[in-house]
């Protein structure tokens, strides 16, 4: 099995090295990742300049682009052999609920949706590395068992691991995405020369975080696994829209 590994924290981030170490004994792994932190890049592609891959001393490939660029190039000519699946992470920080709309970690996995194996996005619910071994364990466990998994084509599995030692993790729960409240207002700053700027503030707290959600699972000490799809059509709105459009003609 051949796996393409990517992330959004950057090619030198500890999480991607940990993911490689977790999977390298079970598969032929190749790493293509951004040359700098691209958190929040979502599924953006770089269209205003050429992309220049550079192989590092450890064999990883660094790219001056986004997480999606990395996977896109990896699946479309940069690699001699097409991977069987894409695995993204390990992100240092949660990708829960609405986070998946902005996450470069999730976006990298989404770009791998056309392959025969399901794509995985792994995130540790912490900015610290203390419990990376826990995330490594579950990444290895889930990816190595993927051949027994029967899911529709183009399924992306978003996995969040609680910030706990392995012996304190209570298990794995299948979850749906929760929802966050509106984010805090951007923080205004003024530099010494009087020029104004803004920092994007923290994401909102869980507004829909009850039982069954990814938020609830990790708070209770479980690994959360949420299947994602690309169809973002809001089917429940069809009735009202159909009636509204009928009244316009």
From Swiss-Prot:
Pfam families: SurE
UniProt keywords, alphabetically: Cytoplasm, Hydrolase, Metal-binding, Nucleotide-binding
InterPro entries in UniProt: SurE, SurE-like_Pase/nucleotidase, SurE-like_sf
SUPFAM superfamilies: SurE-like
EC number annotated for this UniProt entry: 3.1.3.5
Positions annotated to bind a divalent metal cation: 8-9, 39, 91
Record's cofactor remark: Binds 1 divalent metal cation per subunit.
Catalytic activity: a ribonucleoside 5'-phosphate + H2O = a ribonucleoside + phosphate
Record's protein name: 5'-nucleotidase SurE
Gene designation: surE
């Amino acid at each position: 099995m051949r796996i393409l590994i990517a992330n959004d924290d950057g090619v030198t981030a500890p999480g991607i090295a940990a993911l490689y170490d977790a999977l390298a004994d079970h598969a032929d792994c190749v790493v293509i990742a951004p040359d700098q932190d691209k958190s929040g890049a979502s599924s953006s592609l770089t269209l205003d300049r050429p992309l220049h891959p550079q192989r590092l001393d450890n064999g990883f490939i660094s790219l001056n682009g986004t997480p999606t660029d990395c996977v896109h190039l990896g699946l479309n000519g940069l690699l001699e052999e097409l991977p069987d699946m894409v695995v993204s992470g390990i992100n240092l920080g949660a990708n829960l609920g609405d986070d998946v709309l902005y996450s470069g970690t999730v976006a990298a996995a989404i770009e791998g949706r056309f392959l025969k194996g399901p794509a995985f996005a792994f995130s540790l619910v912490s900015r610290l590395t203390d419990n990376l071994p826990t995330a490594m364990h579950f990444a290895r466990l889930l990816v190595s068992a993927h051949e027994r998994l029967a899911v529709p084509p183009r399924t992306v599995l978003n996995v969040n691991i609680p910030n706990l030692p392995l012996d304190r993790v209570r298990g794995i729960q299948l979850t749906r995405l929760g929802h966050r409240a509106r984010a805090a207002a951007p923080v205004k700053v003024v530099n010494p020369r009087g020029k104004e700027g803004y920092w994007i503030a923290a994401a909102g707290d869980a507004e829909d975080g009850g039982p069954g959600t990814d938020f609830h699972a990790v708070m209770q000490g479980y690994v959360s696994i949420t299947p994602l799809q690309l169809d973002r059509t809001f089917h429940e709105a069809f009735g009202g829209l159909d009636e509204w459009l009928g009244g316009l003609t």
